[in-house]
Amino acid sequence: MKANSVLRSTLPNAIIAVLESRKRVKPRCGSLPQMTISDQRALHLPHMRANPFSARPIEVDGAAMLVGRKTVMQDLSLHLRFRNPRLMVLQGERGSGRTSVLHACANLSPEVLTNTMFPEQDPVATLLSELYIRIAGYEVPATTGMLVEQMVASLEGRSGDLPLITFDFPGVGGEELAQVFERLTPCLCRLKAIVVVALTPAQLAAWSEDLISSYDVTVPLPDLNAKEVRALIDARMRTVSHEGWAASDALIDEALAATGGRPAGLIRHFRDLIDAQR
């Protein structure tokens, strides 16, 4: 009992209030822990039209919710505006927000060619044909050489910001991707465009040094710190409430300890926390 009293004396009052209220509420079997009125007050939750913490990747119209990725977005914007063609690898662990970054990039260019479905058969020919259709037209040439030459000619004749071509295949192994991009890269490097391939460090590790040397590889997308977690909360809450959520430092520290600051983990953590009040 004495040890419990000492422990309780070191806890913030808000956390104690949540713990005490949960002792009095018996959760339903198979459900999230119920959150009482005192829980809600302790967490300072505002009125919300919906739960803003969705685990889906951010889409184009949700780019304002992207947090902690300012540097990579600025670099891409600069290359597109100054018409500086290049091949890039956007590197990040699973859950770091690679796909969300690529979706948000759609705001940076008037023409974005996304590739997210990996072809099961002859992926090199299929991906090149799909690119050709979107760049040059529906009558795909019979040979790869003619196909590439016509894509190059079509892009050379354009003015304005460069098109952005992205590849995002998180479910494909690094060795298989390496084989595909060994053959694709000589074609991609001739296109007057920004080409971005999203890879996990594990996928990138399977690429040869020669292949990697053709690309500008970003530093891995970092996990979020406490300041960025608060910015993430603010950005999400603005989409569903006219009020902010004054989440306590203790709550944010708890979320960081549970997730390591990985964006996908943080989103699920706060989603479940808010769902628990329903």
Positions of predicted regions on the chain:
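A short, basic N-terminal segment
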Residues: 4-84
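Walker A/P-loop nucleotide-binding motif
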Residues: 85-102
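Conserved catalytic segments around the Walker B and adjacent sensor/switch elements
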Residues: 109-121
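Conserved NTP-binding/hydrolysis module of P-loop NTPases
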Residues: 122-142
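Conserved Walker B catalytic segment
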Residues: 149-197
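A short beta-strand-to-loop transition that corresponds to the Sensor-1 phosphate-sensing loop
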Residues: 197-203
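Helix-loop-helix "sensor" segment of P-loop NTPases
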Residues: 203-254, 271-274
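The conserved phosphate-sensing helix
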Residues: 258-271
